[in-house]
Every structure is written in structure tokens, then in C-alpha cells.
Amino acid sequence: MKQKLLCLLPFFLLSGCGQATYKNASLPAEERAGLLLKELTLEEKVSLMMDSSKPVERLGIKPYNWWNEALHGVARAGLATVFPQPIGMAASFSPETVYEGFTAVSDEARAKNAYYTSQESHERYQGLTMWTPTVNIYRDPRWGRGIETYGEDPYLTSRMGVMVVKGLQGTNDGKYDKLH
């Protein structure tokens, strides 16, 4: 009996070695991120700071493109719902409507990302990182990007910006993770 147990000892010792600690989903995200950062070399960290991140295969990090835009819908990755420009959304004075719109935007973005990921495609405009909202206050009509803002009212702009983020990120009680 002792001999059989001794033969199984290496199996038990090595069975816990298969997964890196930072991949342990039962640990808090902050702890996992810290553990992963300790594993990355300086060169790998720098490579992950680009809009198009190459994979770090030795750690199981897949390629990712951080460049996506959802100013008024998911941009440039096939068909999507196109909502009014932010200046038009602000004219509604309805933060709740903006929230509902960006809830739809995040659902579309998640679906598109799932499709492209299943095709092993990681191109620009296929990720889950959205460059929105623009919360600059529109003060000078000569600024050509004024329509990308929620106007000149700081209070309204702040309410609209908050609802955009809440719509995109969701409430964490859904069936899947939204855009975090």
C-alpha cells in the first residue's frame, strides 16, 4: 500500500502546477492583475501599452486591439444601430434615454466582439474598449468636434456622461459581463 501511495505522490504534487496563480478566477481581480504584472517582462508590458497588443503566448495573453469607438453606436465593424450625435442626445434632456441607448450599444459591441473573437480576428474596431463619452464642454463654436460633446452645460454633460458609462458597463447582475 505504501508503495502505491508513493507512486501517486508526484501526481498529487504536480497536479496543482497546471494553472498560473493569476488565472485563478476565485482571486480578486486586483490581486490577479498584480500577480500578472509580476510575471510580465518590461518589454511585454510596453508591448501591451499599444492600441494593438500582440499576444504574450508564454502567459496565455491573447492579442487585443484597444481601438474601438462608440460615440453614437458601435463604429466601423459592420452593421450597427446608429444613434444621434451626442449634441443631439443632449438636446433630449433625457439621461435615461441615453442610458438605454448605450445599453444597446454595449450589447451590440459584445456580440460583435464575440463573433470576431470566434473568427480569431483582433483588428481595430473589434474590441470592447470604447473611446466615449466625450465630456469636454463645448465653449468655442470654431471647434470642429463640438457635435461629439453633450453641449455647453456642465451639469447636463456630467449627467449624460455618467449615463453613457453606466449603459456601457451595465449593473454587473446580468448574464454576461458588459464593457469593463
PLM-predicted stretches and their roles:
Residues 17-180:
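Glycoside hydrolase catalytic-domain context in secreted enzymes
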Residues 5-14:
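Sec-dependent N-terminal signal peptides
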